[in-house]
Amino acid sequence: MGIQGLAKLIADVAPSAIRENDIKSYFGRKVAIDASMSIYQFLIAVRQGGDVLQNEEGETTSHLMGMFYRTIRMMENGIKPVYVFDGKPPQLKSGELAKRSERRAEAEKQLQEAQAAGAEAEVEKFTKRLVKVTKQHNDECKHLLSLMGIPYLDAPSEAEASCAALVKAGKVYAAATEDMDCLTFGSPVLMRHLTASEAKKLPIQEFHLSRILQELGLNQEQFVDLCILLGSDYCESIRGIGPKRAVDLIQKHKSIEEIVRRLDPNKYPVPENWLHKEAQQLFLEPEVLDPESVELKWSEPNEEELIKFMCGEKQFSEERIRSGVRRLSKSRQGSTQGRLDDFFKVTGSLSSAKRKEPEPKGAAKKKAKTGAAGKFKRGK
């Protein structure tokens, strides 16, 4: 789920924090990608006649086709992807995971009813709601990536938290995921729609945390409190407080604790046994991989092993896979060329061809605590 309504809220109250770019704008950029989110997208989008792709044995192959071709597309545009896989979910997420199981059970029931009624559109809708990324999906994608010469990392816990740590440490330019809580984990730059289908023609959205904090007049700890009020995967929110009200309250009272002290408990009852302090700690001090121990390396694809796996085992067309391997090898030759701005120190929150807007007076003071939650210093 991420953070409820955060993307729309930022668009409404801090629009200068969002840029929209074409994929070609990221030539030479290293990007940490939330692997589970991407695989989920592939299982939803890569379909034939409404059903997931399967081989003759009935094994799902949509995730492999999506991972293979979307990764090649990124490489052809000069992007160097590193996929980060989820580890063990934090205990705080158990409530959210239980709710998801309940929703899947309800979707299963509705699917059976739609099938009995012959309602094709409803069948497709509820089938997609049952999609779940499994350990087998993850393991097969890891194997595919290793054969393609694309690096991947196993996070100890939430992938988006480790993606954020890689950005903060300067190992990659941005974190790519649809989950907005990557910003709550402190990622300086978040990219959305990077692995979306080309057919959707969605521009890549780029969110800059420093500009969000500046526009809202918040530090990272206060932004975390705002996100908890909006609704996250880790604890309940206070019912009756919408996005605009949440912003007003955090700007006025500066912390959840002070907000709770001032609220009318009859009008805005605080959840029983509210775990907001635990959620604060999880966002500010998440369990992440050590960026300094990470060495990212992109290597030549292993064509024959790819053929053996994708064609021999998974029954993809050999002609198409070999064509993909040729594209991948060719893209590596072009992507070795670096970006010009890699050779210079880039200042400001928006380092792009677009001119940076002048900062309002006093903004420097507001930025003093930006990124205070991060454990890692940004690399050179």
Curated annotation (Swiss-Prot):
Composition-biased stretches (Basic residues): 363-380
GO molecular function, one term: 5'-3' exonuclease activity
Pfam annotation, one family: XPG_I
PTM sites of type Phosphoserine: S187, S197, S255, S293, S335
CDD domains: H3TH_FEN1-Euk, PIN_FEN1
Modified residues (Phosphothreonine): T336
InterPro entries to which the protein is assigned, alphabetical: 5-3_exonuclease_C_sf, Flap_endonuc, HhH2, PIN-like_dom_sf, XPG-I_dom, XPG/Rad2, XPG_CS, XPG_DNA_repair_N
Protein name: Flap endonuclease 1
